[in-house]
Structure formats: C-alpha cells, structure tokens
Amino acid sequence: MNIQLLQVFLTTAREGSISKAALTLNYAQSNVTNKIQQLENDLQTKLFYRHSRGITLTPPGQILVSYSEKILHTIEEARAAMGESSAPSGPLRIGSMETTAAVWLPQLLAHYNNLYPNVDLNLVTGPTEQQIQAVLHYELNGAFISGPIEHPDLVQEKVLDEEMVLVTSASHPVISSIQDVQTQTMLVFRKGCSYRAKLNHILQEEGLLPIKLMEFGILEAIIGCVSAGLGISLLPRSIIASHEKEGRIRSHTISDKYSFVSTMFIRRKDTLITPALSAFLTHMRDHFQIKRPDQS
C-alpha cells in the first residue's frame, strides 16, 4: 500500500473536502482526486460518498482512517527512532486547555525551551474533548486536560487540582447558594469544554436546568463580559485571581462537593517516548512535584 496515498486519504478525511485537502497538501484538486481513486482501486472499495455538499466517509473509509493513523504514526516513530540521539530534539506537540496554558504552563514551557533549544515545541490549545481526540489520533504527543478520564488507550498523570468559583461583576451581590444563579445568564465556552460540562453537572444535580447560556470562544471575552455585567461564569480561581485583585470581577465559592477539578496529563500507551517527550515528562513532574507512575 502506497504511503503517499494514505497521507492524501487521511488529510482529505480530516478536512472533509477535496479542495481543502488540496490546499493543505499544496496539490492540485485533480491530483488529490486521482490519488483517492487510485487508493480505492487498490482496495477495490469506495472510501468516500460524493454528493453536492462535498464528500463523506463510507463505512470502509471510516475503518481505513483508524488504520491510516496507526500506519503513518508508526512510520513517523520509526524515522524518529532511526535519527534519534540522546539529546532531545525534533518535534514535540503538546495540547492544553486554554486556562491551563495561560496560568500554569508559561514557566514550564519557557524553562523547557531554554534547556532544549533543538526541540521544536508546539502548544495547541482547545477544550478537553478536542485534546483527547487529538492524542488518540496521534496528532499530539500528550495533552493537559480536565479529568480524570477512563480510556484503554491512554495513560494519565494527575498534575494539579483547581478550585472552581462562580465569577460575577464586581458590583454583584454575594451568591450564597448555587440556587441563586437560576435567573442568571451563564457565560460558557463552546461545547467540549470540561468547565461547561462541570457547570451542566452542577445545574442538573441542583435541578436548575434549563438555564440561559451564552457561548464564547475565548477566555478574555468571558471575563470581559462578566465584568460588564452580561452574566456570570464558572471558572478556576487561578485564572481570575488577578482580575479580581484589580477590582474588575468578584468570585463566589461553591459547595465543596462541586468546587474542585483535576488537571491531568494524558498520552497514548503506545506512543514512542522520544528523548524530547521523556525530557518533557521529567521536567513536568519536577515542576508540578509529581511522582512518576512507577513510584509509590
């Protein structure tokens, strides 16, 4: 099976469009179409449905996506192993929730980057579910997510615990009970965010659903709109502490049974521990004072 054909197929499947895949690969659209047809002929099956809105994967195509990811990842690992030296170098892609990246990672990443300048370190931010899928599909070497989670293909290490608080404008009255938010507009991240899932769990437990939600893409927008009195939000205390100190917003504690969430670092069990990743894991454990998984 031709590796280039698999790369073209997987890119097309991820982009969901031949034209977008062509742009990503810097190919002509006709070249992408021809390579997909060649792969379909080799496998004697249709991999995509063609329709007026574009393309979608057939059942055999969905199966091939998983195999293609594994094959291409194994080839990348083999190349890395062949060129490997004891000094950390090469690409390292780490994912993180936006809030974790903003508060907890700057010093860690800066120190790591100074120690290992030959590592091509790349940080990708996004909600927890997006990070999990990226790790599972070999797009990231590891990621900081909200957890814990259970998945047979993942290894996880607890990094820290975060206290969650309700956040309002500075002039907002004290919130003494979660019931007080029933008439408020809740400002949340897009679906897939663990803090939004946490809020939904709390509201469901307290019998407060449905409630009005307003969705935002970035943290700064939520904090700005909370400060202006547009609504309230549920966020880690660490991320809003400086804004509260400036008098822009006000935090309100919630019940202990809801108030803490754990940040975990996940990676695939079968991922190759390159010198770059090994050094990152060691540096991360030292930074957050984490015991190795094999230590008691």
From Swiss-Prot:
Q: Which gene encodes it?
A: gltR
Range of residues in the leader sequence = none
- Specify the species: Bacillus subtilis (strain 168)
Q: Which Gene3D superfamilies match?
A: 3.40.190.290, Winged helix-like DNA-binding domain superfamily/Winged helix DNA-binding domain
The record places the DNA-binding region at: 18-37
Describe the inactivation phenotype.
No effect observed.
Family assignment from sequence similarity: Belongs to the LysR transcriptional regulatory family.
This protein's UniProt keywords: Activator, Amino-acid biosynthesis, DNA-binding, Glutamate biosynthesis, Repressor, Transcription, Transcription regulation
Keyword Transmembrane part of the UniProt annotation: no
Extract the PANTHER family matched here: HTH-TYPE TRANSCRIPTIONAL REGULATOR (PTHR30126), HTH-TYPE TRANSCRIPTIONAL REGULATOR GLTR (PTHR30126:SF40)
In the UniProt record, does the keyword Membrane occur? no
**Can you name one GO molecular function term for this protein?**
DNA-binding transcription factor activity
Q: What does the function comment of this entry state? A: Positive regulator of glutamate biosynthesis (gltAB genes). Negatively regulates its own expression.
Family annotation (Pfam families): HTH_1 (PF00126), LysR_substrate (PF03466)
| Alphabetized InterPro entries for the sequence | LysR_subst-bd, Tscrpt_reg_HTH_LysR, WH-like_DNA-bd_sf, WH_DNA-bd_sf
The protein's name is HTH-type transcriptional regulator GltR
**Record note on what altering L219P does:** Gain-of-function mutation
Q: Name one GO biological process term.
A: regulation of DNA-templated transcription
Boundaries of every HTH lysR-type domain copy:
1-58
